[in-house]
A protein has these predicted regions:
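Residue-identity detector for threonine
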Residues: 14-19, 28, 32, 50-51, ...
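Aromatic-anchored glycine-rich loop motif in surface-exposed flexible loops
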Residues: 1-58, 68-86
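Generic detector of intrinsically disordered, low-complexity, polar/charged segments
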Residues: 5-6, 52, 62, 137, ...
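An aromatic- and glycine-enriched ligand-binding surface/loop that stacks and positions planar moieties
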Residues: 41, 71-198
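Glycine-centered flexibility motif
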Residues: 8, 55, 60, 186, ...
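Extracellular structured ligand-interaction cores
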Residues: 9, 57-64, 163-171
Length: 198
């Protein structure tokens, strides 16, 4: 999906090659989307609903991506004067599959590694400065963490950690740099997103 959004269309490599090849042809954005759709729809039923190991591909991740791909396909069809209704209906169907599965839901209560930390941790202030409605007296902000805060704490990001909003999370290892001693440094990967269309 992101390749289609970033570059419009890319060469589609559908077979493994062991020799150099220089005559790849660029596909259209629609062909790029359709290839991704076809590949994902072919594997969706082979994927587990959940896994014990964080970072592994699950069915809802594919359903989510198919939803996005069908929206993108619909936008492209509309821009080209085509009928986008079936693409949008497929997007709705895949989104409903995730929502209605009962596996994922919005978090409504504090959870995880830092749910019991006191207010001193959050604002480096004493509990004496709290108001009766448990806000920080000078700014009126909640003095304690909340469920939204918990979603992003180390050890809370994954479904396996109790985060029922997490479908498929990028895995971060904050300790890996230590394996090379003092010569290593943290490697922050680049983050990219799709282009915005006009």
């Amino acid at each position: 999906r992101n390749l289609g959004e970033l570059f419009g269309g890319v060469p589609l490599v559908t077979e493994i090659t062991s020799t150099p090849k220089y005559d790849y042809k660029r596909s259209t954005r629609m062909e790029t989307y359709q290839y991704a759709i076809d590949e994902m729809e072919n594997i969706i039923n082979d994927l587990p609903v959940t896994t014990a190991e964080a970072g592994r591909l699950v069915r809802a991740a594919v359903q989510h991506n198919l939803c996005q791909l069908y929206i993108d396909k619909g936008v492209l069809l509309e821009a080209e004067g085509g009928d986008a209704a079936s693409a949008y209906n497929k997007a709705i169907s895949y989104a409903n599959d995730v929502i209605d599965s009962g596996t994922y839901s919005l978090m409504t209560e504090r959870f995880g590694a830092r749910k019991n930390e006191g207010p001193e941790f959050y604002y480096a202030t004493s509990a004496v400065e709290q108001t009766a409605d448990r806000t920080y007296s000078s700014a009126g902000y909640p003095i304690e963490g909340n469920v939204y805060w918990d979603l992003f704490q180390v050890g809370n990001q994954d479904y396996q950690d109790g985060n029922t909003e997490a479908i498929w999370c990028a895995q971060s290892d904050y300790e890996v740099y230590k394996s090379d001693g003092s010569l290593a440094c943290l490697d922050y990967p680049a983050i990219y997103g799709p282009v915005f269309r006009d």
